[in-house]
Amino acid sequence: EALETAVVENPLKDAYFGETHVHTSFSMDAFIGGARITPDEAYKLAQGADVVVNGQKHNIGRPLDWVAVSDHAEFIGEMYSTQVPGAKGGDNPMLEELRNLKSVDEQRAWFLKYVVENNRGENPGHPPFYAGPETTRSAWKDVQIKAAIDNYRPGKFTTLAGYEWTAAPKAGNMHRNVIFRDLNVPDMPFSALDSADEEKLWAWMAEQEKKGSRLLAIPHNSNGSKGLMFEPLDNAGKPITADYARLRSHFERLIEMMQIKGNSEVHRKFWPADEFAGFENADSVGSFSGREFKKEYFVRWAATKGLDYQAKLGANPYQFGF
């Protein structure tokens, strides 16, 4: 707090540039794909330092002002066992196989079996090489949170503790990055293995608020959600109510519209009069897992639908910042 009070704020405000969706080697999908940058190294890279990964030097060029490393919560315990010397479960032969994946075919097979098929199944769970909740706790506190603390430079570079809740019911992406405003964080993240129901995520977030946490969830990839992101029914199959709208808008004040899986704001097929609607449409995402795009998958549609809810319910579940 003493450090923070020494920071001079501009009363006219400043523009800051950062990132809330960063994956490192502690995300299983990234590790399978060859990522070996740690959370600590990711923060250093964001600040402009040279970082050597897989034998190659990398530099971001222009440093960022703030970053949240948001690795997938679902398998960070497994990745802790995989990478931290002496960690519980690290000698599991399956993890030795994971550490030594070579070909694209081997990587694809691991990704489909332990990430895609598991996460999108009826009952997602930990793989057989999970060594228990203490590894998840260690990955969260000793790696993720520690990296955020160690790289925080008040007034110069802001780190934000966070993680990704990676639910994919019915193969529809319902992913959210959960970001904490300070270090009043839980001992364990709430992952999609605890529940793939976003309403239960919000209930958990409400419990954290009661304990003093300040947090929000940032949805992304609505284009790949199969319509679930902006569905007119709650998870009990009932029409959205004012209470639902208020709860959602309380915790989900922002939405991520652009990332590697494409643009979730708009699509040229549905807004042909918009000359910029063809940017990063990522049609390949629409052809994967039966996710043929519909207008209702996109943020622009949700923004207008939210006005309807405001008129009918007195509350808007889709009043997002972009």
Give, region by region, the residue ranges found by the protein language model.
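Extended, charged catalytic domains and RNA/DNA-binding interfaces, predominantly
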Residues: 1-322
